[in-house]
């Protein structure tokens, strides 16, 4: 029996795939649990349309992410911070702080999840920060922590 999968099923296929399975498996397991539907003409057309829309949406997300990354890579982002002796910061620069600063400077909303930092930055200097944006877009931006001497 041909079925269209409504959810990812290990060993069988992914959502939207059309698969040939045994009649009993489809009638007694997949269909009653809402994991698959019988592959009728209408269902096949609906799945194709959903796949096209999903691919189009993913393309738009990727293009938007690439534009955001290009905007961020155009400059070195200076981050003022209060420092003590030896260039050590009072506190630390985290991905949350950095996302707020980048959002303010670039005019584009930057999610803290896009910033890949192993640990918070605690010293002044120039850093390469890895960005992981939606759509599989990756790149690095330059961030310079500039000290404001406490007087």
UniProtKB/Swiss-Prot annotation:
Pfam families listed in its UniProt record: Ribosomal_L9_C (PF03948), Ribosomal_L9_N (PF01281)
Keyword Manganese among UniProt keywords: no
GO biological process: translation
The organism's place on the tree of life at top rank: Bacteria
PROSITE patterns: RIBOSOMAL_L9
GO cellular component, one term: ribonucleoprotein complex
Record keywords, A-Z: Ribonucleoprotein, Ribosomal protein, RNA-binding, rRNA-binding
GO molecular function: rRNA binding; structural constituent of ribosome
Key word RNA-binding present: yes
Function: Binds to the 23S rRNA.
PANTHER family, alphabetized: 50S RIBOSOMAL PROTEIN L9 (PTHR21368)
UniProt similarity note: Belongs to the bacterial ribosomal protein bL9 family.
Name of the protein in its database record: Large ribosomal subunit protein bL9
Lineage, top ranks: Bacteria, Thermotogati, Thermotogota, Thermotogae, Thermotogales
């Amino acid at each position: 029996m041909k079925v269209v999968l409504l959810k990812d099923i290990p060993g069988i296929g992914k959502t939207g795939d059309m698969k040939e399975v045994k009649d009993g498996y489809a009638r007694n397991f997949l269909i009653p649990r809402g994991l698959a539907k019988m592959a009728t003409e209408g269902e096949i057309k609906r799945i194709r349309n959903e796949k096209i829309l999903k691919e189009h949406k993913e393309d738009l997300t990727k293009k938007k992410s690439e534009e955001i990354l290009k905007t961020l890579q155009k400059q070195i982002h200076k981050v003022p911070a209060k420092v003590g002796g030896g260039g050590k910061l009072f506190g630390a620069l985290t991905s949350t702080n950095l996302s707020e600063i980048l959002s303010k400077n670039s005019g584009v909303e930057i999610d803290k999840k896009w910033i890949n930092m192993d640990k918070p930055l605690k010293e002044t200097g120039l850093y390469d920060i890895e960005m992981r944006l939606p759509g599989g877009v990756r790149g690095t931006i330059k961030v310079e922590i500039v000290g404001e001497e406490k007087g």
